[in-house]
């Protein structure tokens, strides 16, 4: 009789923990991986940003989606997942591999892939728990438009070293913003 009771108690504790943390340890592992990805991005820099000032561009990062005070963690996870997926897609393109040190690029992409796995675990916990709000759909569309403008920019600049440096710096800001969003939300829990 003690074993079934203990088993039930474990299930109750685990389900409570899942409900409170969205079923994953995202704030700790994701934050550490994000910091490592930011460090790798910094190490990937090949040119001084000052030498590429003429190539700078505002890609229209959806900052209002990150700054929104009313955003909940459940809404932030799909947003950060889409950001991470788009960054990984950008840096695994054939044109990207020619622009960076292969070892650093592989490590960076591996970190992004691990972050995506963490985020997917959270998304799976959310499936069926909540509906997909229209504002969330708008956020994902804004992210896709943002990365489309980056892709178009790289094409227009013929994937030049300066264009990639501008994009690297932009992605660094984007990753930093997503990390700050998740850190803020984890403090609110």
From Swiss-Prot:
It is found in: Secreted. Keywords: Antiviral defense, Cytokine, Disulfide bond, Glycoprotein, Secreted, Signal. GO terms for molecular function: cytokine activity; cytokine receptor binding. Disulfide bonds join 24-122, 52-162. Induction: Transcribed constitutively. Not induces by viral infection. One of its GO terms (biological process) is defense response to virus. Gene3D superfamilies: 1.20.1250.10. InterPro entries: 4_helix_cytokine-like_core, Interferon_alpha/beta/delta. GO terms for cellular component: extracellular space. Residues 1-23 form the signal peptide. SUPFAM superfamilies: 4-helical cytokines. The keyword Disulfide bond applies. Glycans are attached at residues 94, 101. Belongs to the alpha/beta interferon family. Exhibits antiviral activity against Theiler's virus, Mengo virus and vesicular stomatitis virus. Interferons alpha stimulate the production of two enzymes: a protein kinase and an oligoadenylate synthetase. This is Interferon alpha-13. It comes from Mus musculus.
